[in-house]
Curated annotation (Swiss-Prot):
This is Protein Wnt-2. Gene3D superfamilies: 3.30.2460.20. It is found in: Secreted, Extracellular space, Extracellular matrix. The keyword Lipoprotein applies. Palmitoleoylation is required for efficient binding to frizzled receptors. Depalmitoleoylation leads to Wnt signaling pathway inhibition. It comes from Strongylocentrotus purpuratus (Purple sea urchin). The lineage of its organism: Eukaryota, Metazoa, Echinodermata, Eleutherozoa, Echinozoa.
Length: 115
């Protein structure tokens, strides 16, 4: 007597929740890279225990400190900054580590006061 057995195999996608959690984890652990003009290679902006693998997410941010006509950036050299601000207009961020000069101006204005 002959018996026949059949085997069916298929691949199934993981649940959407599993996919989204994996993507979120990859996004959070993404490597912020910087292009080194000296070595002509990408290197991580922050030191880590290992270099990114082929499956890790990496990203670049343009250097807004230096002028780049191709990308429409005028750079930050010569612009005024706010010494007390921690935002994008603050000297710490805008001056890109180049330092800055403090300028003190004395302005006399008429306040139209009446006594």
């Amino acid at each position: 007597s002959g018996s026949c057995t059949s085997q069916v195999c298929w691949n199934a996608m993981p649940k959407l929740r599993q996919i989204s959690e994996a993507l979120l984890k990859s996004h959070i652990q993404a490597y912020h890279m910087m292009y080194s003009k000296r070595s002509l290679k990408l290197r991580p902006l922050q030191e880590r225990n290992r270099n990114p693998s082929k499956t890790d997410i990496v990203y670049l941010t343009p250097d807004y400190c230096e002028p780049n006509k191709r990308h429409g950036s005028l750079g930050t050299h010569g612009r005024r900054c706010n010494k007390t601000s921690t935002g994008v207009n603050g000297c710490r961020l805008m001056c890109c580590g180049r330092g800055y000069q403090t300028m003190l101006r004395h302005v006399t204005e008429s306040c139209h006061c009446r006594f």
